[in-house]
Every structure is written in structure tokens, then in C-alpha cells.
């Protein structure tokens, strides 16, 4: 067994991911608003946050999830940091484009609701909002038996 700690050794094909994202973006470009109109994208190289025109200002948004770290949280049954991690990934993406995060929405998908787990994730998200000085403006909780096998958490920051 290899001691390598990279995407390929974990089963992730970065080249295939890149091709899939390029295909997705290529399909979406036809629906993009035109420059000079509210909501039109602003191209800023190197950023993970999306920028759009918003009158005389720019609005920045970022979406990210906790990813494979949720497998660790599930294995050790510790949820106290997953909301903070989710917020941090999103806030960091906005800071990278020079934006100040002001609001956040979350998306939690589970195979079956668990009030104790939901309370712990909620407490973690509340702490994350406090740390980032961001308002939790809403979110979605989806019970998806047969579609997801363990909790998934993602969010969008504005």
C-alpha cells in the first residue's frame, strides 16, 4: 500500500473532475446574463468566489461543503466543528476576492433525521456565524434515504 497522501491515491481523478467542471461551465455559459446587467458575472482570475454585477457594486458568493471530513465526524460521532469548517471554507473563498461576508445559508442532507446530530451541527453553525460575524439567513434540511448514506453539509456565503 502506498503512503502517498494525494487525491489520486484516495480515488479522486483530478483530470476527470476538471473535464466535468469544464463541461458544466460550457453548458451554463449560454444562460449567463450579459455584461452591464444586474447579475452579470465578473471574471476575476484565481478566485473561488463568484462575483456578479449589482448596480454600481459587486456582489460576491461562494458555495462549498465540508466534504470527506464528514466521514471522520461520522466515524467519531463528533459534530462540533463541521459547521465551523463549512463556514470557514466559504468565508475564505470570499475573502480571497476581497469581499466581506455578511450572510450564509446552509444545506444539510441526511439519510434519516437525528435531533442530537442536528443540534450539534446547529450549535457549530451558530458558533461559525459568531466567529465570522455573518448572519445565518436560512437553509435547507433534506431527508434523503436511499440517496445519501451519511450526513452531508454545505453552504453558500454572500
Which residues does each predicted region cover?
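N-terminal amphipathic/basic leader segments beginning at the initiator methionine
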Residues: 2-35
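Glycine-rich phosphate/pyrophosphate-binding loop regions near the starts of catalytic domains
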Residues: 23-158
